[in-house]
Amino acid sequence: MFNLRRLFASALFLGLGLLFLAQTAEAAKGPKITHKVYFDITQGDQPLGRVVMGLYGKTVPETTENFRALATGEKGFGYEGSAFHRVIKNFMIQGGDFTKGDGTGGKSIYGDRFKDENFKLKHTKKGLLSMANAGRDTNGSQFFITTVVTSWLDGKHVVFGEVLEGYEIIEKIENSKTGAADRPVEAVKIAKSGELDVPPEGLVGTSEFAAEEVASAGWSPMQKAGLFAIFAGVLFVGLRSARQHSRF
């Protein structure tokens, strides 16, 4: 009987250990990138280059679709030709107001404004895309790209993507000379925008995110293996115990 208990405990601890390792491995991967979009950016008459961004469509599908469709312009309106109207060094660069250009306009593909989808992802690093707003549930088309960790924005702004390529261009914009209302003296514009292909299995973002994002994504193969190990261990102990009892 003692050996059975020890075997049961070993199986249980093995399964729980596998679950822990699976959770840790998944957390190290970061959120799933389902779409890629690009901005070809100019400053004045000079091209700065292309910024490629990955969007977290599994975690925030509605916010991702809004940004993706505005990047392609498939609804008849979008980011192409609009400016980065607000730049604050050691904070962020902000754009997306394609109706007024001064931070008071813009609109979403769902109407004028749409609700905060969720706050599962945090502002844990530079190069993140997050929705600009005027308060709760006031998302439109305006967005910002972080240039530092901005944890004070957690729970207030929806993180939905990250810069994959061209972050040096973001740094150039961040270091632009600005005037009133933090507007760049020399206009910084999105000359062209669109969508790029993503492999069918998707891509994975970088790892500076809380484990709650992993939990929201469902069970991974490694986590399923851990559960199977626990189940198999318990089943084995149960069968062995039944055999021993059948001898008496």
UniProtKB/Swiss-Prot annotation:
Tree of life domain = Eukaryota
Q: Which residues are glycosylated?
A: N139
Q: Which family does it belong to?
A: Belongs to the cyclophilin-type PPIase family. PPIase B subfamily.
Signal peptide location = 1-27
UniProt protein name: Peptidyl-prolyl cis-trans isomerase B
Activity control, as annotated, is:
Inhibited by cyclosporin A (CsA).
So where does this one cross the membrane? 219-239
What EC number(s) does its UniProt record assign? Answer: 5.2.1.8
Q: What does this protein do?
A: PPIases accelerate the folding of proteins. It catalyzes the cis-trans isomerization of proline imidic peptide bonds in oligopeptides.
Specify the enzyme's EC class, one word. isomerase
- Single Gene Ontology BP annotation: protein folding
Q: Which InterPro entries match?
A: Cyclophilin-like_dom_sf (IPR029000), Cyclophilin-type_PPIase_CS (IPR020892), Cyclophilin-type_PPIase_dom (IPR002130)
Identify the residues that the record assigns to the PPIase cyclophilin-type domain, covering every copy: 38-195
Its source organism is Gibberella zeae (strain ATCC MYA-4620 / CBS 123657 / FGSC 9075 / NRRL 31084 / PH-1)
What is the organism lineage in this UniProt record? Answer: Eukaryota, Fungi, Dikarya, Ascomycota, Pezizomycotina
Instruction: Name the catalysed reactions.
Output: [protein]-peptidylproline (omega=180) = [protein]-peptidylproline (omega=0)
